[in-house]
Amino acid sequence: MVSEVEYGSGMSIDVSAVRNHFPSLSRTIDGQPFAFFDGPGGSQVPTVVADAMTHSLLHANANCGGAFATSIESDAAIDESRQAAADFTGSKADEIAFSANTTTLQYLLAHAVARTLEPGDEIITTELDHDSNVSQWLQVAADHNLVVRQARLHRTDGTLDLHHLESLLSPKTKIVAFTLASNHMGTVPPAAEIARHAHSVGALAWADGVHYAPHRLLDREAMGLDVLLTSPYKWFGPHLGIASIRHDLAASWPANRVRPADETPAGHRFETGTQSHEAMAGMTAAVDYLAGLGTGSTRRERLTSAYEAIRAHEDALALQFWEGVSGMDHLHFYGITDPEQFDDRVATFSFTVEGAHPTEVAQRLAQRGMAVWDGNFYALSASLALGLEEGGGAIRVGFLHYTTPEEVDRLIGALGELG
C-alpha cells in the first residue's frame, strides 16, 4: 500500500493522494501496474493541467490585445503565466520568455547574444550538458568566428571538473553554459560557484535547468544566473519552453521580430509570433499544482515548502534504490555512488548491464511493465566521455514525487533478475 511519507521538516506528502491527480499512473500492462521510471525524459501530467489547457481552448481562445471578452481573458491568462513562471524560476515576470520548447529558445537566444560578441570571444560548455546547451554554441561559433571550450567531467563519479573549468576562463570568456543537473546521471554541479567564476571574468552564467526543476526548486537570482531555461513537460506540465533572462539583457539583446510586435515586457521581445496560449495556461496550472503540495502565504513560499518535501521523498527513494542494487555485480553505474555525496545528485541513475545491450534491457523491463530509457539521452558529451556511445549508451531510470517505494522495490527485483 502507498502510504503517507513523513519528513523531518514536518511536511508530509500523501503519495496516494498525489497519484490520484495523475490518471496515467493507474495504467496497467497485461494486468500488472505500469511503473513510470521515464521521468527524466518527460513527466506525467495531473488532471488540472489538462483541464486548464482545455478551458483555454474552449473558453478563452483569442489572440492578444482585443477589446472583447475572450481576448481580455486570454491576455489575463498570459500575464498570469508570466507571473507563475517567474515565481517558479525565482525571477520577475517581465524577464520571462516563452517558446515551443527549450531547445528552440536555446538556439534563439544563442543567436541573439552572439550578435553582441566579437570574433575570438569564447564560450565554455561542459561535458555534463544536454546537447541543447552545447550544439547551439558550436553553430553560432562557426557563424561568428567564436571559440567554444568544454569543461571535463570526472570519469570516476560524473562530477564536473571545476579546476578544469576554472583553467578555461579568460578575459575572452563571454558565456559559461552549464547544466544545473545532469539528465544522464543526475549530477548537480555547484551552480552559484560556477556563476561566481563566470562573473569574475565578466562572463554570463547561462544555465539549463530542465532536469533540475522537477527535483529541486529553481532560483535564478539566488544562484546568480543571468539566463535560466526550463521545460514544463519535465515538471508535470505541457510541452513548452521557458527562459528567465536578466532584465537588462532581455531588454537590450537584438531580437528577430516583425515590425508591429510589442517590445514589452522585455522577455516578450524573443517570442516570435503567437504563442501556445493553452500550453501557457497548462504551465500555470502545473506551477499551482506543485505549490499546492506546500504551505505558505505566497506562491513562492508554497513552492519552497513543497520542494522541501519533494526532495526528501526523492532522496529516500534514491537511497532505497542504491541500497538495493549496489551489491549487484552485473550492474555498472555512472555518476555519484557514494551515499554521503547524494546531496550532489538527484534521483536519476544511469547504468549498464554486463553482457546486455541497453536497448535489450529496456525492452525486457518494458515487458515487465516498467518504462525506462536507453541510449545517450541527448547528453552526447557525457556519453562520449564515459566511453558509452559505441556500445549503445546506458539505461536510465528516474524517480519523481509520485514514485512509490513499492515501485522502486519492483525495479530492484527486476534488475536483480538480469544477472
Task: Label the predicted regions.
Residues 2-419:
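Pyridoxal 5′-phosphate
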